[in-house]
Regions:
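Flexible C-terminal active-site loop/helix
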Residues: 258-304
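Alpha/beta enzyme core
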Residues: 2-239, 245-249, 253-256, 290-304
């Protein structure tokens, strides 16, 4: 029996009104492995985290389609049955590029992606000063993604994101999302929700359509827990800074300690073997043994 793809699995979950998807933000293979090890059933590949980890730059439209697709593919293939929702920015161009983005993400194993209505020189949705394309251009992007998905008979989930709230206000944001829904988008995403009351209102105003909540702590949106989002009626919640925020703090403290004391001072359990086990060491050793290899017959523990 063929394996159900991650995209199909996510689509089936969205068709089940009782299902609720919590996706922590990950930005590289290590953060993805840690999230999977914690038991999450979906992941979110953050564009901000990708820009920071791949390029060392802020989320200002630095990443190309190739950057994002390669990172999304690597993360998706760590656990091919686990849905990965990936940032796809503006689709990286006009309708032809949006279609190409859709096709490449789908063939890379990505389960879902979101496309927004900022200009190509975009910025993080929780920064001020955003500039939007007109609604017709936005809808063209969504339509191009939906039609590309249909052409290749893919189940990849198309998420329509609008950044209009901070620029044009709530009513135009809802109008844009309705237009995206009419163009075939599977899920709606209002970026930068500013209150819990607004969160409840958008669910009411777009009733019957699955909605995603973006929970960026200390950004434009007040703290909303996964349980609260579920009770409000959202179907997906993502936490883009769930990994990169704590990683920054931990690495900063370790570097300061190394600079000050001449050694990072890692805890005793932080051995190479432990870190490699997070990254599939035991599974790789099993593959070698089952194929008749002898590379790991003696194990990998140091003899002291």
């Amino acid at each position: 029996m063929p394996m159900v793809t991650a995209a199909t699995s996510l689509r089936q979950a969205l068709a089940n009104p009782e299902a609720f998807i919590v996706a922590p933000g990950v930005y590289d293979g290590f953060s993805a492995r840690i999230a999977l090890g914690a038991g999450f059933n979906a992941l979110y590949m953050t564009g901000a985290g990708t820009a920071a980890s791949v390029h060392g730059h802020a989320d200002l439209g630095i990443c190309t389609l190739n950057d994002m697709r390669a990172n999304a593919e690597m993360i998706s293939n760590l656990s091919p049955t686990t849905p990965v929702i990936a940032d796809a920015d503006t689709g990286y161009g006009g309708p032809i590029m949006v279609a190409r983005t859709t096709e490449q993400y789908s063939r890379s194993g990505v389960a879902a992606f979101h496309i927004e209505d900022q200009v190509q020189t975009k910025r993080c949705g929780h920064l001020g000063g955003k500039i939007l394309v007109d609604q017709d251009t936005y809808v063209t992007r969504i339509r191009a993604a939906v039609q590309a998905r249909q052409r290749i008979s893919s189940d990849i989930v198309v998420i329509a994101r609008t950044d209009a709230l901070q620029v044009r206000g709530y009513e135009e944001s809802i109008a844009r999302l309705r237009a995206a829904r009419d163009a075939g988008a599977d899920v709606g995403f209002l970026e930068g929700i500013t209150s819990k009351e607004m969160a409840r209102q958008v669910v009411q105003d777009l009733a019957g359509w699955p909605l995603l909540l973006n929970m960026v702590e200390h950004g434009a949106t007040p703290d909303i827990t996964a349980q609260e989002a579920k009770e409000m009626g959202f179907r997906i919640i993502i936490f883009p800074f769930a990994a990169i925020g704590p990683a920054y703090k931990a690495m900063q403290e370790a570097m300061e300690k190394l600079k000050r004391d001449g050694i990072p001072g890692l805890s005793e359990e932080m051995t190479p073997q432990m870190l490699f086990r997070v990254c599939g060491l035991d599974e790789s050793m099993k593959v070698d043994a089952e194929a008749g290899g002898a590379a790991f017959e003696g194990g990998v523990e140091l003899q002291k």
